[in-house]
Every structure is written in C-alpha cells, then in structure tokens.
Swiss-Prot record:
Residues 627-636, 866-877 have a biased composition (Basic and acidic residues). It comes from Neocnus dousman (Slow ground sloth). The modification 4-hydroxyproline is found at residues 10, 13, 35, 41, 341, 344. Prolines at the third position of the tripeptide repeating unit (G-X-Y) are hydroxylated in some or all of the chains. Residues 1-979 are annotated as: Disordered. This is Collagen alpha-2(I) chain. Belongs to the fibrillar collagen family. The lineage of its organism: Eukaryota, Metazoa, Chordata, Craniata, Vertebrata.
C-alpha cells in the first residue's frame, strides 16, 4: 500500500526486522485501487529504520534478516541504499511511519478523438410504453396542416422498454402528416436495432423540440419520408430540457394505397443480452394497424443535415427503439425512391436526386436486445441508414457501431473504491509489462538499487462479465468516451513471482486490438430494466504526495495476447451526445431516376429551423432556385423555392433560412435529390498511443547511509613497531643513610695500583640538593680484578676528621678515571649512617660501564616521553570480511515523470458499420450556399399535392423559376460548424 518511504532516516541498529514503512506514493496514479494487503514484514525487510539508537554493545553481527514477503502493494519506491547492519544492540525499533498519502489520482487518459459535443445530462428515465404494432403504411395523402407541437412534458421516470411490435409491412403510402410531437419522454433503454431497411425518401425534418427525448410512443405508421435536405449547418445545441413523458402518438395518417410490399428485412441480430432483466418474449408481429387520421403536419423544417455526431458521453438510457412520436412533420416533399444504401463510405459528392418513388417497406425491426450493461458506451457507430423519418425523435437505432477502443488507462493510482459507475468496457490487453528495474545492490549504503521488476502479474482472470448495471448515478457530464475497444483477450497469467519491488508503472501499452465482435446472441425478449444501482461515483481519494519518479523499469515482456474476449453486453446507448462533427460526405449514390414530379406542396410555414444541420440545399432558399411558381404552391413550376435546393427539386425544400425558415416552403419540390447517405463516420481512430512516458524523474535522493555494519574481524596483529627511543632513565634511588664513619685506621701503604675497573654505569644525575654529607658508599660493585702487587703495609688509621660543613652539592663531575686501588686498609668499623643527603643534581652521564648484574627490578619510572612513531609494521593478513550490511533503506520514489505528450492520433480505422442516425443536431449556422450541382435528370412530375394551409411564416419571396423537372444535384460547400 502506498506510503512514504522514510528510508532516508538514519536507522538504529536493529536486531529485529525494521518496521517497513511502505514505499512512497507513486507519481500521479490512476484511481486508487483498494490497497493490496501488505505482506507480513520479513525479518530485516526493507522498512525504514528508525533513528539510530545509542550504539549497543557490539554483539555478534546480526545476519540480515530474510526479506519479508512483500504483499502486493502500491508501486514501490526505489529500494533505499542498504545500510550496514547495526551491531546487535538495543536500539529501539524505529517508529512506524505513517502510510503515505494515496497517490494522486491520475488524470484520465485523453479521450479518444471523438466528436466534440459535450453530452447533456440524461434526464431520468421515462417509462417506455410498449410499442404498438406498426400501422400499415398510409397511402400518400395530401398533407394536412401542421398541428402545433405539443408541449414538452416533464420527464417521467424511465419505464421498462416494451417489446417492439412487429413492423407492419403495408405498402408504402404517401406520408400522412405527422401528428404533433408528444412531449418528449425520457429515453428508454435502447433496443438492438434491426437491420436497416432501405432508406426511405427523406422526409422533411420536423422542428426539433428541445427537451429530452420522450419515450417513444407507439409509432403511427410512418409516412414515406420526404427527401432528405442537404444538411444545414448545425446550430448550437439547445439546452436539454427535462425529459418529457411520452406523449400520445398523434393519430396515424389515413391509410394510403398500398404500395408493393417490400421484402421485410431480416431481423437484425440481437446484441448479447446484458445481465439485467429477464428477457421478455418477443411479441408476435402485430398486424399492421390501420393508420389513424393524420395529425396536422408540423411546420416544415428544412431538412437538417445530420448533426455532427457528438462525442459519446455516458449514455443515457435510450428507450426502446420504438418510433418516437414524430415531431410535427414538415410538409412532405415528394418522396424519391432512395437508392439502397451503399456501404457507407466516405461521403462522396451528393448524388443526383433519385426519382421519387415509393419506398419499399422497411424491413422488420429486429427485436430490441436487452440493454447491455452500461459500459462506457462506445461511440455511436455510424448509423445504418433507416428510412428517414421526419427528424423528430430518434427512430430506432441502427446497429451499434463497433465499440470504440478503450482509451488508454491513465496511470493507475491507488484505486478508490469504485463508484457505481457502469462497468468499464472491456479492458484492452494488458500493456507491456514495465521493465523490471535492476535490483538495487545491497551493500553498505549502496546507491538505491533499481526497482525490481514487478513480479509477473497474477493471473489475469478472464474479464468478468460485466456486472449488472447499477442504477446509473447522476450522470456527470460525461467526457467524451473514447471509442469502445472490443475487449482484448485476457493476457495469460504468469505465475505470480515474488513481488519484486514494484517498478514504476511502465507506459501503458497500446490498446489491444479490438476483439472480434461476438456473434449476435439470440434475440432475447426485451428484459425489463434492472433496478438502477445506487451510489454515485466514489469519492476521489485524497491526493497523495507524488512520489519521486521511479526509474523507468525495463520493459517487461509482453504478455501473450489472450484470446479475444467476447464482446461485452451491449451497453445501453449513451445519452445522445451533442452532434459530433459531420462525417465526410459519402459518395453520392447514383442518381435514381427522377420520380414523378410531385405537385408542389403548399408553401408550408417556415418552421423554425429544425435541428437541421446546414440548411444546405434544403436550406435557405437562399438562392431559391425555387420555382417561382412553385413558390408557395404555385403550379409545380420548377421546383418551389427550393432555393438552394435547386437541386432539390425545384422547390428548395426549405426557403431561405431566413424568413423562410430553414426550409422555404417546399414548392412542389422536384424531388429533392436524395441526400447521399452520409458516409459512415470513420471510426474514430484508435486513440493515439499513449504519450511516451516522460523521462524518468531523477532518482530519489539516495537514502542516508545505512547503519554502520558490524565491525569486521580483527585483522592479524601488525608487526611490532620499532622500539621507540627509550624514555629518560628513572631517577636514581635515594641513597641509604651513611653509616657512622668509623675511626680511620692508619692509612695503609698504598698498594700497587689495581687495574682500572670498567667504568661504572653512570648514575642518573641526581637533583641538585644541598650537598649532604657523603653517604656511605653504595654497595661495592663487583670487585675488579685484584691489583697485583703485594699488599702495602697498612697505614695507621687517620684520626677522624671533623665532618665538613655541608657544602652545596656540586654537579657531579665526570667520573675520573678510577685510580688504582690502594691497598685495602683495614676495614674500619662501620660508622653511623649519615643523614640522607638531598638528592643531588644528576651528574653528567658517565660513559657506560660494563653491564652489571641485573639488579632487582626497580619501581617503574615515570612514563617516558612518547617515542617517535615506529615505522608501520607490515600489513597483517586481511581480516575476515565483515558481515554483509543490511540493505539500506529504500529511497523515496522519484517524482513521477511528466505525462508524455499525447501520442498522435492513430490511423483512422476502417469505417465501422453505419450506426443509427444520431439525433439531429441543433440547427447550425447557415452554411454558405453551395454551388449549384449539375442538373440531375428531370424527375417525373409528381402528382399535385393539395395545398396545405399557409404556415405562419411570411411567404418567402418567390424564387426565380428553377429549371424544370430534374432537381439539381446540389454540391455542398457549407462549412460545417461544430455544434
């Protein structure tokens, strides 16, 4: 577990293992995981030693304890320098350090390059009504007047998704006017989309209601979609209103004549069921209900372009893919047959408008899959092109795009307790293991060893199935999710090695390749949504002190890539993000044959610009190539004010964005060219590789020197130094008292001179005292050899002399040569001992006499002056090596390196399957008018529609007559604005 490494403190000698204070906090970490259990400290582990105690008596050197098993722990700091093992003594154990503060939570990796819109907060879930059976398509009726849009209800609680009713397959009729949009309910959980049927002719876009999406009501029978206008610039998103309850669906339009029955599309695959809810049974395909009378048409919005796809935020729960209540429908333009959608590619130039024809019936919608667990939703895949409905509430979602790759993980911090966030998407394969740092040397106070390799990770379990979806917490504004990666295969688990010191975290590996997409599961009946889990996101742990940057570990071996995991359950679609940037236009489909020329509709009122994106060709009838006549409903002259939509039929589908509302009233539009399908948005490329991990920070400060190791064995004794110079001789001992002088005998005659004795050893000079009487002679030295000669006659003894007065003692003279000994006189009697004289000054040193016999050892003299230092003796043999010192304390971890720069975005991946159309973005600013496209072939003249009631807007100025017949393919140069 993270902590500060106090290894730089001085350590007391220890007999026991030091108390380990764990390694310091790492650098910025990802969210703090629950701390691993600490292993029991082994004897003499790496713990920091406390402050040194007083040195104990040197005991035996303790041997360093074994290393304790290190429990899994946060990243370790560098091992400190090993200290020398202290003598075994009684130092106190160091205080246990407090655990370091948890590391700062790492910043999340940069989001994948998703669209940029921020996601609104999803409202509460509304209850989803069960979709009723789809009515049969009505025949083309005249468009009734547009009813006013119903007020947006407040969001109801989310319901469980009903099972989708079967899609009716009546012939395609002309679209009846849509009823007014019910208030928008909350989005229910998304169902799995069925296969996308061939695109219908695009209907005019309804006005976008602001507000949360209502739960889809039961859909009335869809009218034929009118041609899709060229998207106007995307307006800024309106604020998300509260989700409305689902309004009652408007009455269905009257039943149109039957078109030929299209083949029903096969049901789309169901995504794997999420863990929540039991699957309900799929309802039988209902009979197509008859369509009710058409509600009044909504104001005609200019067809909006697809909004830019927003980045996915956290997905709100999307309701079942029932058709939502349509927003008030704009006046329908003539429908062109749509060509079948090509593979979505990049959007090419727009194709010439197809001729309006009947739309084949849409295939059945696939059953709604159970909502998957809410992973982080991947970006919405490119939409399959469904029948374009009026752009009102989103219709059923197309199949989900591939999940984007999971963004790179930030550095893992200590994980906080996981909040009730949804499960993460599948984890990419583990990044390469960081290199194991070299093990620091142990030695006395070596520099800190490099950090050991992380032991092989424990076996990675299979990625668990996503847990049940918790109740979504309040959604924060989700950041844009990176595209969801498919789950990488779990790496093989290595055996768990002993934990080395944990190396710094290696840079995250690149995201693993997307796993294969799992096979669609059997279509389950829609389950009921599980109860929402409670709990908001966990608290962010306190930021730890950033540890020093660890040395960069060596690159670990890359684990084997595990097998691709199954796709996780499909997450509930995220809340609709703000429209992302528009994808590049796909190549236009071939122009369909011109449809019969529809009769010019009345000039609808110019609705407020729908969420249409650019009011491109359908946009402002800026240049209304509109047929003037077609103006409001003039005869279908050239297309009505399709201003810029010259190409869109004569009637620009929308009058100038200006007064004419984004769509001028649609004259009889020549059929607007079918908008080429928007190319699928390319997949967001995988997130660029993580930035390079910044250079490792400087190594942490070296730990302080460890304790001194035990004393090595004593080396052999060196040779004795040379003897120092002798100290001065000790003082001479005091003389004994002199005997009393005997009476002198008469002097004998001098005998012949004896041989000179060897000079006696000089006595030490005595201190100069007063001269005493001469003492008795000291002991006789060994007699010299006898002088030869006959003994002289003994002289008479002299009389006693008077004692001399005590003179000062002179310095001792140098000893004169010894005279020849006189013949010994008779021994006088021993006189009384004289008084002890004071010590005389030392006489000068006489020459050295022969060595006398060893006398008894005198008392030790005072210590002599220290002699000069002798020469060093030879070096003794090397002592035994000392015991190995303890490991030094672990150094603090280095500071975390700076985050590397974000890697450049990876190459754009292949386009994924087209996702469902995103919700229309808010109306963008008007784009610049594009250049007129080439004139398409003339469409067949459509039947004249009856004039709708005048819309509330002022009529647009009549456009100049457009070319008659064919719509122009309108090239589109409008700038895309990011919403």
């Amino acid at each position: 577990s993270g902590g500060f490494d106090f290894s730089f403190l001085p350590q007391p000698p220890q007999e026991k293992a030091g108390v380990g204070l764990g390694p310091g906090p790492m650098g910025l970490m990802g969210p703090r995981g629950p701390p691993g259990a600490s292993g029991a400290p082994g004897p003499q582990g790496f713990g920091a030693r406390g402050p040194a105690g007083p040195p104990g008596k040197a005991g035996e050197d303790g041997r360093p304890g074994e290393r304790g098993v290190v429990g899994p722990q946060g990243a370790r700091g560098f091992p400190g320098t090993p200290g020398l093992p202290g003598f075994k003594g009684i130092g106190l154990d160091g205080l246990k350090g407090q655990p370091g503060a948890p590391g700062v939570k790492g910043e999340p990796g940069a989001p994948g390059e998703n669209g940029t819109g921020a996601r609104g907060l999803p409202g509460e879930r509304g209850r989803v009504g069960a979709p009723g059976p789809a009515g049969a398509r009505g025949s083309d009726g005249s468009v009734g007047p547009v009813g006013p849009a119903g007020p947006i209800g407040s969001a109801g609680p989310p319901g469980f998704p009903g099972a989708p009713g079967p899609k009716g397959e009546g012939p395609v009729g002309n679209t009846g006017p849509s009823g007014p949009a019910g208030p928008r309910g909350e989005q229910g959980l998304p169902g799995v989309s069925g296969p996308v049927g061939p695109p219908g002719n695009p209907g005019a876009n309804g006005l976008t209601g602001k507000g949360a999406a209502g739960l889809p009501g039961v859909a009335g029978a869809p009218g034929l979609p009118g041609p899709r206008g060229i998207p106007g610039p995307v307006g800024a998103s309106g604020a998300t209103g509260a989700r409305g309850l689902v309004g009652e669906p408007g009455p269905a339009g009257s039943k149109g004549e039957s078109g030929g029955k299209g083949e029903p599309g096969s049901a789309g695959p169901q995504g794997p069921p999420g863990s929540s809810g039991e699957e309900g049974k799929r309802g039988p395909n209902g009979e197509a209900g008859s369509t009710g009378p058409t509600g009044p048409p909504g104001l005609r919005g200019g067809p909006g372009s697809r909004g830019l796809p927003g980045a996915d935020g956290r997905a709100g729960v999307i309701g079942p893919a029932g058709r939502g209540a349509s927003g008030p429908a704009g006046v329908r333009g003539p429908s062109g047959d749509t060509g079948r959608p090509g593979e979505p590619g990049l959007m090419g130039a727009r194709g010439l408008p197809g001729s309006p024809g009947n739309v084949g019936p849409a295939g059945k919608e696939g059953p709604v899959g159970l909502p998957g667990i809410d992973g982080r939703p991947g970006p919405i895949g490119p939409a399959g092109r469904g029948e374009a409905g009026n752009i009102g509430f989103p219709g059923p979602k197309g199949p989900a795009g591939d999940p984007g790759k999971k963004g790179h993980a930030g550095l893992a911090g200590n994980r906080g307790a996981p909040g009730p966030d949804g499960n993460n998407g599948a984890q990419g394969p583990p990044g390469l293991q960081g290199v194991q740092g070299g093990k620091g040397e142990q030695g006395p106070a070596g520099p800190p060893g490099f950090q050991g390799l992380p032991g092989p990770a424990g076996t990675t379990g299979e990625v668990g199935k996503p847990g049940e979806r918790g109740i979504p917490g309040e959604f924060g504004l989700p950041g844009p999710a990176g595209p969801r990666g498919e789950r990488g295969p779990p790496g093989e688990s290595g055996a768990v090695g002993p934990s080395g010191a944990i190396g710094s975290r290696g840079p995250s590996g690149p995201p693993g390749p997307d796993g294969n997409k799992g096979e669609p599961g059997v279509v389950g009946a829609p389950g009921t949504a599980g109860p929402a889990g409670s709990g908001g996101p966990g608290e962010r742990g306190a930021a730890g002190i950033p540890g020093g940057k660890g040395e960069k570990g060596e690159t670990g071996l890359r684990g084997e890539v595990g097998t691709t995991g199954r796709d996780g359950a499909r997450g509930a679609p995220g809340a609709v993000g703000a429209p992302g940037p528009a994808g590049e236009a796909g190549a236009a489909g071939p122009a369909g044959p011109a449809g019969p020329r529809g009769s010019p509709g009345e000039r609808g009122e110019v609705g407020p610009a729908g969420p249409n994106g650019f009011a491109g060709p359908a946009g402002a009838a800026g240049q209304p190539g509109a047929k003037g006549e077609r103006g409001t409903k003039g005869p279908k002259g050239e297309n009505g004010i399709v201003g810029p939509t010259g190409p869109v039929g004569s009637a620009g589908p929308a009058g100038p964005n200006g007064p004419a509302g984004p769509a001028g009233s649609r004259g009889d539009g020549g059929p607007p060219g079918v908008t080429g399908f928007p190319g699928a948005a390319g997949r967001t490329g995988p997130p660029g590789p993580s930035g390079i991990t910044g250079p490792p920070g400087p190594p942490g400060a070296a730990g302080k020197e460890g304790l001194r190791g035990p004393r090595g064995d004593q080396g052999p004794v060196g040779r004795t130094g040379e003897t120092g110079a002798g100290g001065p001789p000790g003082f001479t001992g005091e003389k004994g008292p002199s005997g009393e002088p005997g009476t002198a005998g008469p002097p004998g005659t001098a005998g012949p001179q004896g041989l000179l004795g060897a000079p006696g050893i000089l006595g030490l000079p005595g201190s100069r005292g007063e001269r005493g009487l001469p003492g008795v002679a000291g002991a006789v030295g060994e007699p010299g050899p006898l002088g030869i000669g006959p003994p002289g006659a003994r002289g008479p003894s002299g009389g006693d002399g008077l004692p001399g007065h005590k003179g000062e003692r002179g310095y001792a003279g140098n000893a004169g040569p010894v005279g020849a000994a006189g013949a010994p006189g008779p021994h006088g009697s021993v006189g009384p001992a004289g008084k002890h004289g004071n010590r005389g000054e030392p006489g000068p040193v006489g020459s050295v006499g022969p060595v006398g016999a060893l006398g008894p050892r005198g008392p030790s003299g005072p210590q002599g002056i220290r002699g000069d230092k002798g020469e060093p003796g030879d070096k003794g043999p090397r002592g035994l090596p000392g015991l190995k010192g303890h490991n030094g304390l672990q150094g603090l971890p280095g500071l975390a390196g700076q985050h590397g720069d974000q890697g450049s975005p990876g190459p754009v991946g292949p386009a994924g399957p087209r996702g469902p159309a995103g919700p229309s973005g808010p109306p963008g600013k008007d784009g610049r008018t594009g250049h007129p496209g080439a004139v398409g072939p003339a469409g067949i003249r459509g039947s004249q529609g009856s004039q709708g009631p005048s819309g509330p807007g002022p009529p647009g100025p009549p456009g100049p007559p457009g070319a008659s017949g064919g719509g122009y393919d309108f090239g589109y140069e409008g700038d895309f604005y990011r919403a």
